[in-house]
Every structure is written in structure tokens, then in C-alpha cells.
Amino acid sequence: MSDDVSTLLRTISWFAEPPSVLPEHIGDWLMETSSMTQRLEKYCAQLTVTLCREGFVSPQSLGEESEQLPPDERYWLREVVLYGDERPWLFGRTIVPQQTLDGTDSALTKIGNQPLGRYLFEQKSLTRDYIHTGCCEGLWARRSRLCLSGFPLLLTELFLPESPVYYTPSDEGWQVI
């Protein structure tokens, strides 16, 4: 799944501002400023993470994502799928410049199969520069540049088809939007 989704991420059309055609329910998810991990946990009994890819990559392998981060010799890349009750809900891709790891600590490289949000939102120095929304093949995504003690990282989240972002509660249970 990781390679297919990684390829899909490169084709996302990004918007600086959410498009006016965005359904309100989906826009609310995409513009979430708190922990997406905590929000997803409200919709399942168990949220799990499968680590798809992790390690250092060169700037050349990032493509246009490198424009969102300061130049560096190498970047830490982490790709995961978050599952809600064993259903794939979210593909996450985190890119961390080496200088961010040097400037804060290397804990970001040791998260393993824990959700990134659990670590990030425990940090008092966490700030968010922006949220860009995007869409590709009917799937919605968001991209945020976050900073830990002023050092940036890029987080891209693609909401997979079974994600609660595409459903809304109704009298008959959850309905597809």
C-alpha cells in the first residue's frame, strides 16, 4: 500500500485555502488544529499504526515537498497507515530535516509504531505554520508545516476511503457523504 499511496501523494492538487466546494463536514476534518490522532480515536475502539517506511532520504527524493522545508543534506522520512478497528483510515507521511533532529532531539526517529500525534502534541514548543488542503482521485488530504522549538517538519495526511472523514452520523448509523 505504501508505494501506491506515496505515488498518489505526488499527484495531489494543493490549495492554499480550502476550496469553496468542500463539504463542511470534510472541511472541519481537514482544518483540525488539534491532534488528528485524538480525533480519530473518538471513532474507534482501537487505533493502530503500521510503519510502512522509515529512514533518511536525500533532498532529491522529495520532489516539490522540499520547497516546504529549509534545505538540508538529508531528511528523515516516515510513512505510516493509521487503522481504526483494523480499517485503513489515514496514510501519513512525515519529512523531518536533519537540522530539526539536531535542534530538538532525535526522538522523532524512534517513535516506531506509535502515532506521531501522541508525541507532537505533548511538546509545549509545537506550533503550526499552515494547513494546505488537497484532493486526488476523490480522496482528501492535508499538509501542515509544524515546528518544534522553531525547527520545521512537514506532515502530509491522506484520508483513505474508509476514514470517518467521509461519513456523517445519521439516524440510521454512519452515512457516506
Swiss-Prot record:
The answer to whether keyword Lyase applies is yes
Q: Which GO terms describe its molecular function?
A: chorismate lyase activity
Gene Ontology BP, a term: ubiquinone biosynthetic process
Cellular localization per UniProt: Cytoplasm
- Give the UniProt entry's GO cellular component terms: cytosol
Cited InterPro entries: Chorismate--pyruvate_lyase (IPR007440), Chorismate_lyase_/UTRA_dom_sf (IPR028978)
Q: Which UniProt keywords apply?
A: Cytoplasm, Lyase, Pyruvate, Ubiquinone biosynthesis
Residue positions annotated to bind substrate are 36, 78, 116, 157
EC number assigned by the record = 4.1.3.40
Q: Which reaction does it catalyse?
A: chorismate = 4-hydroxybenzoate + pyruvate
Pfam family of the protein (one): Chor_lyase
Q: Which cysteines are joined by disulfide bonds?
A: none
> What main location does UniProt list?
cytoplasm
Its annotated pathway?
Cofactor biosynthesis; ubiquinone biosynthesis
Tell me its family. Answer: Belongs to the UbiC family.
Q: How does it assemble?
A: Monomer.
Function of this protein?
A: Removes the pyruvyl group from chorismate, with concomitant aromatization of the ring, to provide 4-hydroxybenzoate (4HB) for the ubiquinone pathway.
The name this protein goes by in its record: Chorismate pyruvate-lyase
Q: Which organism is it from?
A: Pectobacterium carotovorum subsp. carotovorum (strain PC1)
The encoding gene: ubiC
